Amino acid sequence: MKTLLLSLVVMTIVYLDLGYTLKCHESENLDDHVVCEEDETMCYKFTFVPFRDFEIVARGCSASCPEEKDVVCCSTDLCNK
């Protein structure tokens, strides 16, 4: 009986995909965040400075880290501050 219950628990976890979902900031307002899609395992922060003393920051989820100069990636919840 115990073996049957253990098997059912394992099957439930496998089939329901109780996996971890990443949360990333997505705007200038650090109180806002988004739950990433299953294939998006990285948070990114892209900083663009078109003019002196003027900065544009983009944040969000990504499946991989772009190899751009001003992109910082991380893989824990809300790490892209």
From Swiss-Prot:
Q: What Pfam families does UniProt report for this protein, alphabetically? A: Toxin_cobra-type
Q: Which cysteines are joined by disulfide bonds?
A: C24-C43, C36-C61, C65-C73, C74-C79
Naming one, the record's GO cellular component terms include: extracellular region
Gene3D superfamilies in the cross-refs: CD59
Asked if the keyword Repeat belongs to this entry, the reply reads no
Signal peptide range equals 1-21
Q: In which tissues is it expressed?
A: Expressed by the venom gland.
Q: Where in the cell is it found?
A: Secreted
Q: Name one GO molecular function term.
A: toxin activity
CDD domains to which the protein is assigned, alphabetical: TFP_snake_toxin
InterPro entries assigned: Snake_3FTx, Snake_toxin-like_sf, Toxin_cobra-type
Keyword list, A-Z: Disulfide bond, Secreted, Signal, Toxin
Q: Which family does it belong to?
A: Belongs to the three-finger toxin family. Short-chain subfamily.
Q: What is this protein called?
A: Three-finger toxin 3FTx-Oxy6
The species is Oxyuranus microlepidotus
